């Protein structure tokens, strides 16, 4: 009797499980277009181009105004009128204060770019993040170095006042060098981001799978390259795992939302 009751309960459990599986299989399937829209990630461009162009124009305008101010306040016949217009400040003080404002703009631009590049990194664009990691910070580094050079010039100016017209020319030379180097970096960065946004690539891991499938082999180790260092391999593996975790969590939420809408 005990064996009979055990067999009946097992059979009843199998029937219940079979009924549940049949009900699950009979559930309406999600449309293929909706599945494709969920599985294929939507491309989000990196919105840093306009800020970089605007910052380059501000940098150019600042250096142009500095050249005009130095010329009219030191080398033209309107020297007294120019000094009266900036009174009670000296010309070097005005240049340094405006230079500080420009440096703060570069700090804001670097933080803004870093924020959006981290978001692109979480979406799987690991190569873009690495290739622009130092490039986007170069203008800020250049201007920080220029600030140190200006402090050195001003400290020497207070100690040696024999040639008062030499120091504004040295300041102008530093500003021109900063302008050339930072604008070159901003242009290179802007072109690279513009090409990335225009091409609208898929995440790096999807592109690598496509290339491996085309060549007929599968890469057994994520991020492994024979020419890469161990640090690069570990960093890329960590970034890839973080992207996959983020993508799987987002995909699960979207599939659950679509399934609830079908009910």
UniProtKB/Swiss-Prot annotation:
Belongs to the TMEM192 family. Disulfide bonds: none annotated. GO terms for cellular component: late endosome; lysosomal membrane. It is a multi-pass membrane protein. Homodimer. It comes from the Eukaryota. Keywords: Endosome, Lysosome, Membrane, Transmembrane, Transmembrane helix. It is found in: Lysosome membrane; Late endosome. The keyword Membrane applies. The lineage of its organism: Eukaryota, Metazoa, Chordata, Craniata, Vertebrata. The keyword Plastid does not apply. PANTHER family: TRANSMEMBRANE PROTEIN 192 (PTHR31592:SF1). It comes from Xenopus tropicalis (Western clawed frog). This is Transmembrane protein 192. Its main location: membrane. The chain crosses the membrane at residues 53-73, 88-108, 137-157, 169-189.
């Amino acid at each position: 009797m005990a064996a009979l009751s055990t067999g009946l309960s097992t059979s009843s459990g199998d029937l219940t499980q079979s009924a549940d599986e049949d009900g699950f299989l009979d559930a309406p399937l999600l449309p293929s277009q909706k599945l494709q829209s969920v599985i294929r990630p939507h491309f989000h461009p990196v919105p840093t181009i306009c800020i970089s162009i605007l910052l380059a124009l501000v940098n150019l305008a600042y250096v142009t105004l500095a050249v005009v101010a130095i010329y009219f306040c030191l080398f033209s016949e309107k020297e007294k009128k120019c000094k009266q217009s900036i009174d009670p400040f000296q010309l070097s003080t005005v240049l340094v204060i405006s230079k500080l404002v420009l440096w703060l703009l570069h700090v804001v631009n670097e933080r803004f770019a870093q924020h959006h590049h981290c978001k692109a990194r979480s979406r799987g664009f690991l190569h873009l993040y690495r290739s622009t990691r130092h490039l986007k910070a170069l203008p800020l580094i250049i201007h920080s170095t220029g600030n140190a050079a200006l402090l050195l010039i001003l400290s020497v100016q207070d100690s040696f006042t024999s040639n008062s017209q030499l120091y504004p020319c040295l300041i102008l030379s530093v500003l021109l060098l900063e302008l050339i180097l930072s604008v070159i970096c901003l242009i290179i960065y802007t072109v690279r981001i513009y090409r990335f946004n225009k091409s609208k690539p898929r995440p790096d891991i999807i592109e690598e799978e496509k290339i491996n499938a085309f060549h007929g082999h599968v890469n057994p180790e994520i991020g492994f390259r024979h020419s890469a260092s161990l640090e690069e391999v570990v960093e890329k593996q960590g970034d890839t795992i973080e992207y996959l975790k983020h993508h799987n969590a987002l995909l699960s939420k979207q599939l659950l939302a679509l399934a609830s809408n079908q009910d």
